[in-house]
Swiss-Prot record:
Presence of keyword Signal: yes
Region ranges (Disordered): 298-327
Record bears the keyword Glycoprotein: yes
Keyword terms of this UniProt record: Glycoprotein, Signal
Disulfide bonds: none
Gene: UL14
Protein name (database record): Uncharacterized protein UL14
């Protein structure tokens, strides 16, 4: 064998497999790549418009379409809900189609990527199985020598954990249309729930859309900071929140009825408000009375002056007539 050691038989298969992005046998990261740098303030990553709840465990594809050869680098930037502080990136040279950096498909369950040059447009896609660990935001990013530009962001949610209090029942309702900031699913009738039991005084329920793979979400609790805003905004108008508002109104009614006289702070606040209101009314009454009295005095003085003037005129006329008679 010439003293050299032949590579194992599986190495060509592994190299061929890596062309589809299943392995991380790509070039080392390009540290100065614009697509790996933070997006500038004027080109911040766009907020996802409509987080989607899709079938759990099904394979889906996130595709980014770019104008051909307008940008030297194209990328898909991934923020996973389980690790929001870690950013994964798939960066491809738009001219040659070679991968420059890839730590996205390696850490995503069943992750595969593909780059296609269609002449007028280029397409970079990342496919994977949607499970709890792959939920997050996927952002299309363009890069040149100076900066990067985020063009589109897709938010995907695999499951929703709901903690319910024992004295309140909730009926979560997800929308069937894409609405800004609200979680939606193409077919709400397929929504299913898993009963995860009680945690103290709260009942844990996991909502999901069953997929063809048969995979089910776990009942294990996790913060998933990135997905929490999507979920909390999405369920803000469901029956649970309406029931919560009714309960809050009932509590406020009992507060006004039962605790008005027993809480000294409320009594002092009420007494101060009544005293301040009474003082304002007294000041207004005093000002109005003073103004009315002043106007009355001015009018009486003007009337007296007018009467005196008229009397003087009558006397002068009488004197002049008397003088004319004497003449």
């Amino acid at each position: 064998m010439g003293g050299g050691r032949l590579p194992p038989l599986w190495l060509p298969l592994l190299i061929a497999w890596s062309e589809w992005g299943n392995c991380c046998l790509d070039a080392p990261p390009v540290v100065r790549s614009p697509c790996l740098q933070p997006v500038r303030d004027r080109n911040r990553e766009r907020n996802p418009g409509s987080p989607q709840l899709l079938p759990y465990g099904d394979r889906l594809e996130v595709a980014c379409i770019f104008p051909a050869h307008d940008w030297p680098e194209v990328s898909i930037r991934v923020h996973l809900c389980y690790w929001p502080e870690i950013v994964r990136s798939l960066v491809v040279d738009a001219r040659s189609g070679q991968v420059l950096h890839n730590d996205a498909s390696c850490y995503i369950a069943g992750g595969r990527w593909r780059f296609e040059d269609g002449g007028a447009a280029q397409r970079l896609s990342l496919s994977f199985r949607l499970i709890t660990e792959t939920a997050g935001t996927y952002t299309c990013v363009l890069g040149n020598e100076t900066h990067s530009l985020a063009t589109e962001t897709t938010a995907l949610v695999a499951d929703v954990h709901d903690l319910r209090h024992s004295d309140r029942s909730c009926d979560l309702a997800f929308g069937s249309r894409s609405q800004t900031r609200y979680l939606w699913t193409p077919d709400p009738s397929r929504l299913r729930s898993i009963n995860c039991g009680w945690e103290g005084e709260r009942h844990r329920v996991v909502h999901y859309i069953p997929g063809t793979s048969g995979l089910l979400p776990s009942c294990e609790e996790d913060e998933r900071e990135l997905c929490v805003p999507f979920i909390s905004q999405s369920i803000a108008d469901n029956n649970c929140s309406r029931r919560h508002r009714v309960d809050g109104a009932r509590r406020r009614y009992h507060l006004r009825r039962d605790y008005w006289l027993t809480d000294p702070k409320i009594g002092l606040l009420a007494a101060g408000s009544v005293a301040l209101t009474s003082l304002c009314h007294l000041l207004c009454y005093w000002c109005s009375e003073s103004y009315r009295r002043l106007n009355t005095e001015e009018e009486s003085e003007a009337a007296e002056e007018t009467a005196a003037g008229e009397a003087s005129a009558v006397a002068a006329a009488a004197v002049s007539e008397e003088e004319q008679r004497r003449e």
